[in-house]
Amino acid sequence: MQIPKIIHQIWIGYQDPPEWCTRFGEEMQAMHPGWEYKLWKHDDIFNGIYKDDPFLKEYITNPEVYKWAFMADRIRLLLLRDFGGIYVDLDAKPIRPFDVILNKLNDQHTFFAGMKDSQSNNTLIDCAVYGAARNSRIINECLEEYVDVKWAHGCKTFSEKIIKRFGMDVALFNYEYFYNWQLGENTIVLHDIVETRLFSWNDGNPNKKVW
């Protein structure tokens, strides 16, 4: 089950994305000829494909938890569950095509994500960039967590699932690919990391392979 050549980006909210985000999205699309590219905007989600999703309905109608980050966390999981492909934050500047990543995967890989080394020397997983085959095990397990922790999920739930279930179908890439602060020979995107979206990763499993 291979990860399809589809790039998903999202912009939710009632304002248009800033010019630089729009430009990065256009660069992403131009860099991937032959790929399907989709920028999902507010109406596409809330008045379209996921208008009946109970969690999104509650997020957007509950003033105490009206947070775009909660919504975005769920939306990107839903998109990869239903379509497969690669999710990339809209504020990520593309440097090299994601063909580089797909060429490193084998037929067993149904999910990939990237890590970032922190100043405290912990290894962290971020969710600004990740990819999955349609209806993948990891994505479905993350979505199942919403039943109990719909107000406290984010990338922590996402990261914990990867840690606990990391196996032959999961590929992890080191920080050079998605979360380097400067250009390097492996840089795929440059992204402004938000530390609150990062989580510790236990590297105690000798079977874990990291590029």
Can you say where each PLM-predicted feature lies in the sequence?
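Glycosyltransferase-associated regions of secretory-pathway enzymes
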Residues: 1-72, 88-211
